[in-house]
């Protein structure tokens, strides 16, 4: 049975599933759909064609699904889809997609978006991610699974961040980040690999292989793209080579890499 505060303003066109809790002074618009077990604390605003997945909890003064902050937006149909078991903390803002993008903003499962996180139009966020306080995502950003982004970090539109990456706090990131890398700075560049996340997700032999692969990729000569092509030719059946090198070759913004910033010896630090 759902528990809905008397002061909540809910459109009769909204779809509220069983077991939903809606706190005082929430505002829920026409196209909103809340799956089972969703919990809205007081003063949450949900608008537009917004779907919230099972057991997601949204804290006070978060605003989801309102018109994208894009001057090209002319009221066309677009969506915001949030998966299951997410925690969305106070004052977060998440916009739906636009005609100029994929027409939707997508957030996976089991993510934590801390206070004041901003997710702009057409972003795609995977699962098991943590976005710390004040993280700002511009439009069209893609973030893989198991990514951590430190507080007060700003990320340029169209940037891609692959699985298992760590972005240090107060960074300004304008280029793509391949799998399992750690970046830091303004502008942010790769500083090494995310050992902590790799140990959680991978076997020791695979970690060793990835370290050796990045050491080869980040040689001064040939270029990073040429190195990625060579690795794909020589190790075409290896899933890690495919994942990492294909990501590098697909980059349109370039990779956040400077040879002077990357230490291939950090693996020895245990």
UniProtKB/Swiss-Prot annotation:
Catalysis performed (reactions): a (3R)-hydroxyacyl-[ACP] + UDP-N-acetyl-alpha-D-glucosamine = a UDP-3-O-[(3R)-3-hydroxyacyl]-N-acetyl-alpha-D-glucosamine + holo-[ACP]
Pathway(s) where this gene product acts: Glycolipid biosynthesis; lipid IV(A) biosynthesis; lipid IV(A) from (3R)-3-hydroxytetradecanoyl-[acyl-carrier-protein] and UDP-N-acetyl-alpha-D-glucosamine: step 1/6
UniProt subunit comment: Homotrimer.
GO biological process: lipid A biosynthetic process
Keyword Lipid biosynthesis on entry: yes
Enzyme nomenclature, EC number: 2.3.1.129
InterPro entries: Acetyltransf_C (IPR029098), Acetyltransf_C_sf (IPR037157), Hexapep (IPR001451), Lipid_A_LpxA (IPR010137), Trimer_LpxA-like_sf (IPR011004)
Gene behind this protein: lpxA
Entry superkingdom: Bacteria
GO terms, molecular function: acyl-[acyl-carrier-protein]-UDP-N-acetylglucosamine O-acyltransferase activity
Keywords: Acyltransferase, Cytoplasm, Lipid A biosynthesis, Lipid biosynthesis, Lipid metabolism, Repeat, Transferase
Gene Ontology CC, one term: cytoplasm
Protein name: Acyl-[acyl-carrier-protein]--UDP-N-acetylglucosamine O-acyltransferase
Localisation per UniProt entry: Cytoplasm
A Pfam entry, by short name: Hexapep
Homology family: Belongs to the transferase hexapeptide repeat family. LpxA subfamily.
Predominant cellular place of this UniProt entry's protein: cytoplasm
SUPFAM superfamilies with a match to the protein in the record: Trimeric LpxA-like enzymes
EC top class, as a word: transferase
PROSITE patterns: HEXAPEP_TRANSFERASES (PS00101)
HAMAP family with a match to the protein in the record: LpxA
Function field: Involved in the biosynthesis of lipid A, a phosphorylated glycolipid that anchors the lipopolysaccharide to the outer membrane of the cell.
């Amino acid at each position: 049975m759902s528990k809905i505060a008397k002061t909540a303003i809910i459109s009769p066109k909204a779809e509220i599933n069983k077991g939903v809790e809606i706190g005082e002074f929430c505002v829920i618009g026409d196209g909103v759909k809340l799956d089972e077990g969703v919990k809205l604390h007081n003063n949450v605003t949900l608008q537009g064609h917004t779907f919230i997945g099972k057991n997601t909890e949204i804290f006070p003064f978060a605003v989801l699904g309102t018109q994208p902050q894009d001057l090209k937006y002319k009221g066309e149909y677009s969506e915001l889809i949030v998966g299951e078991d997410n925690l969305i903390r106070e004052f977060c803002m998440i916009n739906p997609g636009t005609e100029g993008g994929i027409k939707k903003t997508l957030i996976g499962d089991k993510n934590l978006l801390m206070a004041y996180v901003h997710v702009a139009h057409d972003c795609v966020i995977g699962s098991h991610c943590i976005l710390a306080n004040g993280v700002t995502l511009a439009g069209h950003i893609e973030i893989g699974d198991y990514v951590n982004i430190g507080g007060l970090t700003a990320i340029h539109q169209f940037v891609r961040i692959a699985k298992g990456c760590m972005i240090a706090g107060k960074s300004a990131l304008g280029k793509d980040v391949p799998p399992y890398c750690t970046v830091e700075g303004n502008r942010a560049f790769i500083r090494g690999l995310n050992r902590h996340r790799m140990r959680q997700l991978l076997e020791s032999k695979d970690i060793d292989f990835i370290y050796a692969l990045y050491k080869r990729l980040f040689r001064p000569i040939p270029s990073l793209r040429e190195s990625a092509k060579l690795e794909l030719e020589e190790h075409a059946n290896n899933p890690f080579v495919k994942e990492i090198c294909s990501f590098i070759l697909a980059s349109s913004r370039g990779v956040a890499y400077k040879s002077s910033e990357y230490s291939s010896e950090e693996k020895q630090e245990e």
